[in-house]
Regions:
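S-adenosylmethionine/decaboxylated-SAM
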Residues: 1-162
Length: 162
């Protein structure tokens, strides 16, 4: 989830021998309330440029790459439960959004699959980033024994229990 300009998807497709990678992103500016614009706010024109960049960057992979321009929740309806081997979450980073994505995509993964994401240790002001808190809470509620975090504190993952 959250393909932005397609860099991570390109890397995955280049070095991973999987059958198909689906990038999901609404490529749409999100609304915010309050007096301060969040530091991660991106205007719609930039989202449109990211979408075109993703299409161009991933075209070389043909049928192995598929983009869905929609929200995570709406796109998830296209996937059956226990049908995915891997899901990577790097969308909105506030607690509620991360928890929602975890709840949406966890059932879509097969037992033994990997649920992963980005920006574990990132915090740079409003809105409060809640990646770590959401992943820890979700893991506790779903009997996930081990959360693995890279040494740079950016990427996290866990295996779906059998």
């Amino acid at each position: 989830m959250a393909s932005r300009g397609g860099l991570f998807s390109e890397h995955m497709l280049r070095y991973w021998d999987g059958v198909k990678l689906t990038g999901i992103d609404p490529w749409k500016a999100f609304s915010f309330s309050g007096e301060h614009e969040p530091k991660d706010f991106v205007p719609q024109q930039t989202h449109d440029e990211f979408y075109k960049e993703s299409q161009h960057r991933l075209a070389q992979f043909g049928q192995r790459s598929h983009l869905i321009r929609n929200t995570s929740r709406a796109a998830s309806e296209q996937f059956e439960e226990s049908s995915l081997d891997f899901a990577f979450i790097d969308a909105q980073h506030h607690f509620d959004a991360v928890l929602e994505d975890l709840n949406i995509w966890f059932p879509k993964l097969r037992p033994g699959g990997v649920l992963a994401g980005h920006d574990w240790g990132l915090y740079y002001g409003p809105p409060l980033f809640g990646v770590e808190k959401a992943v820890r809470e979700f893991s506790k509620n779903h009997a996930i024994q081990n959360i693995h975090v890279t040494s740079d504190q950016w990427t996290w993952f866990f295996h779906v229990p059998d």
